[in-house]
Curated annotation (Swiss-Prot):
Keywords on record: Amino-acid biosynthesis, Isomerase, Methionine biosynthesis
Lineage: Bacteria, Thermotogati, Thermotogota, Thermotogae, Thermotogales
Any one Pfam family match given in the protein's UniProt record, by short name: IF-2B
Described purpose of this protein according to its UniProt entry: Catalyzes the interconversion of methylthioribose-1-phosphate (MTR-1-P) into methylthioribulose-1-phosphate (MTRu-1-P).
Any GO BP: L-methionine salvage from methylthioadenosine
Pathway: Amino-acid biosynthesis; L-methionine biosynthesis via salvage pathway; L-methionine from S-methyl-5-thio-alpha-D-ribose 1-phosphate: step 1/6
Protein name (record): Methylthioribose-1-phosphate isomerase
Length: 346
């Protein structure tokens, strides 16, 4: 039972992740043979993007099950709580992490016996990964309807194949539109401080032969004013029940600018990223990362010694700034409080 994509490879014995910290200068890989190695890869952003984190955690759970296996089922379940906790404590904002781990834990409890349990859990993790690819392609098909031939789309961060198991959410929409024969151009903003737009989105799109122009973060408003942008499409790390969206820091700024210039602002996200238990964006925990991500660039210090740093990894975009949320079940328009719930009633 194997899986191989641009982002990850499951060999049956280990999880191999492309090291996204090294792209585009190098294509290196990290081999994870234990659940703690998977946890480290998530925490250190070897792998990033909510769906990719969720799938990686599921495979981490499988590796943990092999390490913790005992013949007594209840004792095994108890040991797996520790595995889940270690994986869950890596990054707090992306809800797919907790969704995937809860799904694995619930599947284990429902299975209810130790005979064949390791193979069962491996199959469940593979299902999570394969479903993610199918979901992303469905998001792409729905979202492509919103783009016209000749449109230029602004993206923020990386919500492509690298952020998922494959194909991508925001970039999946662009890929699908291009596959339909539409001539789509992309403006990718660099996305400081981790430069996911410059390093990852530009790299991905160039590999696919999609027309991409890189801009710095402070150019997006001017590009909009000049009429160079027809739509904005971003991904999401968590969507609250009222439609507020947590995504990579800088998303809120882009949404405000899009609103000012009358440009549609779309969020592409699977239903696994929608958290109906989170009422509003105020309830979403925002991860803060180390100060060196801001004070250093490419290993070179660019700020004074001992300067104070504020480095939230995410921000929250208010629902009223979002034109629509594109999911694998269709396009959701306001009022989000009502229409997001309908996705889970069908």
């Amino acid at each position: 039972m194997k899986l191989k994509t641009m982002t990850m490879e499951w060999t049956g014995d280990e999880l191999i992740l492309i090291d996204q910290r090294k792209i585009p200068l190098k294509e290196e890989y990290m081999s994870c043979k234990t659940y703690k190695e998977v946890a480290l890869a998530i925490k250190e952003m070897v792998v990033r993007g909510a769906p990719a984190i969720g799938a990686s955690a599921a495979f981490g759970y499988v590796l943990g099950a092999r390490e913790k296996f005992v013949e007594d089922f209840e004792a095994f379940v108890e040991k797996m709580r520790e595995v889940k906790e270690v994986l869950a404590n890596t990054r707090p904002t992306a809800v797919n992490l907790f969704w995937a781990l809860n799904r694995m834990e619930n599947a284990l409890r429902k299975y209810g016996k130790v005979e064949g349990v390791l193979e069962f859990l491996e199959n469940e993790a593979l299902n999570i990964a394969k479903e993610d690819i199918e979901v992303n392609m469905a998001i792409g098909r729905y979202g492509a309807q919103l783009l016209k031939d000749g449109d230029t789309v602004l993206t923020h961060c990386n919500a492509g194949a690298l952020a998922t198991v494959d194909y991508g959410t925001a970039l999946g929409v662009i890929r699908a539109a291009v596959e339909q024969g539409k001539r789509i151009k992309v403006f990718a903003d660099e996305t400081r401080p981790y430069l996911q737009g410059a390093r990852l989105t530009a790299w991905e799109l160039m590999k696919d032969g999609i027309d991409v122009t890189l801009i710095s973060d402070n150019m997006s408003g001017w590009a909009m004013k000049l009429g160079k942008i027809n739509a904005v499409i971003v991904g999401a790390d968590r969507v609250a029940s009222n439609g507020d969206v947590a995504n990579k820091i800088g998303t809120y700024m882009v949404a405000v600018l899009a609103k000012r210039h009358g440009i549609p602002f779309y969020v592409a996200a699977p239903t696994s990223t929608i958290d109906l238990n989170t009422q509003t964006g105020k309830d979403i925990p925002i991860e803060e990362r180390k100060h060196t991500e801001v004070t250093h660039c490419g290993g070179t210090q660019i700020a004074p010694d001992n300067v104070k740093v504020f480095n939230p990894a995410f921000d929250v975009t208010n629902a009223e700034l979002i034109t629509a949320i594109i999911t694998e079940k269709g396009i959701v328009y306001p009022p989000y409080e009502e229409n997001l719930k309908k996705l889970f009633e069908e």
